[in-house]
Amino acid sequence: MPTRSRSKANQRRRRPRRVVVVAPSMAQPRTQSRRPRRRNKRGGGLNGSHTVDFSMVHGPFNGNATGTVKFGPSSDCQCIKGNLAAYQKYRIVWLKVVYQSEAAATDRGCIAYHVDTSTTKKAADVVLLDTWNIRSNGSATFGREILGDQPWYESNKDQFFFLYRGTGGTDVAGHYRISGRIQLMNASL
């Protein structure tokens, strides 16, 4: 037995070790690097426009409340107001309204909403076509085709109103989280 283990040990000692050689990579001639393309178009357009995302919270409001959220120079959103003061023309191209319910499980009713591009309607005139249940969350997204048909709006004129009317009780129903995208053109100097 000892001879067998000794012979294996001798074989291991006699085995030549492998040598690994790593060849260096061939160097490529350096070419002059070009400036990277700007892929994100937001922030500065070809026609001198500028794009800004905005967000705000509206509420809380009761289940029987009616209200108007204005989008333009008379908006409650400071981001919109500040940017409109710096530019001559604007257009809101995208809007998302998320209704966050704070109502109890026993509350009844719904919240009706409407986008008014004429900026003349009252919240009490909202028809119960588009609604959210007062007890559950909901969201609605509006594109350029719904938000207005003019290419650009003067910065002293509202583009549209978001009207809502509740059919619930006097308890707190919830609030809105509103986000959107506004394009601005012709900076005021």
Curated annotation (Swiss-Prot):
InterPro entries: Luteo_coat, Viral_coat
Main location per the UniProt record: virion
Keywords annotated in UniProt: Capsid protein, T=3 icosahedral capsid protein, Virion
The keyword Nucleus appears for this protein: no
Any Pfam family the entry gives: Luteo_coat
Keyword Cell membrane found: no
Compositionally skewed regions (Basic residues) per UniProt: 1-18, 32-42
Subcellular location field: Virion
Segments for region (Disordered): 1-50
GO CC, any one term: T=3 icosahedral viral capsid
Molecular function in Gene Ontology: structural molecule activity
Miscellaneous remark of the record: The N-terminal region like those of many plant virus capsid proteins is highly basic. It has been suggested that these regions may be involved in protein-RNA interaction.
Stated family: Belongs to the luteoviruses capsid protein family.
Role summary: Major capsid protein.
Protein name as catalogued: Major capsid protein
Native organism taxonomy: Viruses, Riboviria, Orthornavirae, Pisuviricota, Pisoniviricetes
